[in-house]
């Protein structure tokens, strides 16, 4: 269940921060809640750094930050292995069978040319969302602060000290150095309690299904 909420957050961040529209997502490919789709957690297409870009996203929510990064990179690596061409072709084919409503006719035609092999003029980007538990967040709530800005400043300092960039870099160098030549854009969300957060998101989206 965590994966579904992660996919929703991934979609929000990619469209909100990178301005790359979603072309299809795994949730929409399922015929019923028990179906399991072995693919990316979201496909996006748009302009990034001035070039046409295909985004293949991953969303992970883990208790441990390092585990979340490792699993996200492992999932991303599937699109650059021995059978990556076939896998990527499958992603595009399935996505075109369930395009997002926000795609214009022109973009749908362009995407069609991508998976038919008529055009390869695009770059690939991997937007990656990792939600993780941070035990220190509870402590921040017990300290007195003069105002909200002081709390924000302290949280920002704490996240900087977590050194997320180094954690990603170390994981890449140890097991996935070949991924360094590709665009990888990480979005991190520290959580006090992952399961509680997931339930809150579920309650906000589907209030009538929440257990009390």
Per-segment meaning from a language model:
Residues 1-11, 29-32:
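A short, highly charged nucleic-acid-interacting micro-segment common to nuclease
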Residues 14, 42-44, 54-61:
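Conserved catalytic cores of phosphodiester-cleaving nucleases, focusing on short active-site segments
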Residues 18-34:
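A short acidic/basic microdomain associated with nuclease active sites
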Residues 70-152, 156, 161-165:
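Acidic, metal/cofactor-coordinating or nucleic-acid-engaging core segments within structured domains
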Residues 146-212:
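Extended, charged low-complexity segments
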């Amino acid at each position: 269940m965590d994966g579904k909420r992660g996919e929703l957050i991934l979609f929000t961040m990619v469209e909100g921060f990178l301005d790359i529209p979603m072309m299809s997502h795994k949730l929409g490919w399922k015929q019923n809640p028990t179906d399991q789709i072995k693919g990316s957690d979201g496909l996006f297409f748009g302009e990034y750094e001035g070039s046409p870009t295909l985004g293949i996203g991953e969303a992970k929510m883990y208790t441990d930050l390092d585990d979340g990064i490792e699993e996200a990179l492992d999932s991303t690596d599937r699109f650059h292995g021995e059978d990556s061409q076939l896998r990527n072709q499958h992603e595009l084919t399935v996505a075109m069978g369930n395009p997002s409503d926000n795609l214009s006719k022109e973009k749908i035609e362009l995407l069609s040319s991508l998976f038919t092999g008529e055009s390869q003029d695009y770059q690939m980007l991997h937007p990656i969302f990792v939600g993780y538990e941070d035990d220190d967040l509870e402590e921040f709530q017990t300290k007195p602060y003069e105002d909200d800005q002081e709390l924000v400043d302290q949280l920002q300092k704490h996240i900087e000290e977590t050194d997320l960039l180094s954690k990603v870099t170390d994981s890449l160098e140890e097991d996935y150095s070949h991924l360094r030549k590709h665009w990888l854009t990480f979005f991190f969300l520290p959580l006090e309690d992952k399961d509680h957060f997931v339930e809150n998101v579920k309650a906000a989206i589907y209030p009538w299904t929440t257990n009390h």
